[in-house]
Amino acid sequence: MKFFIGDNLRLAGKTRHGKNRIRENGDLWEVTNLDGQDSSILSTKACVVPIKESRRDEWRWLDLPSDEHMEIVEHIQ
């Protein structure tokens, strides 16, 4: 699955940590930065921020394609 800056993701928590982030910030997040996408050696990471305007300072990095704490439920382009 290919991601682009500006895409929206619906996330769900896998671990207690991930579930707490979803409870605090909501399940809709926006991709603001991508790192390592052009490398065959490095893993790809996506920086995401919550869609909620009041929580825009609560960014986090997601390891793609599988993150330890969160899973991507829906990719909204």
Model feature map: region roles:
Residues 20-36:
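Short beta-strand-centered aromatic/proline hotspots
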Residues 16, 23, 50-52:
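Short beta-strand segments and strand-loop junctions that repeat across beta-rich extracellular domains
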Residues 38-46:
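Short, solvent-exposed secondary-structure boundary/capping segments
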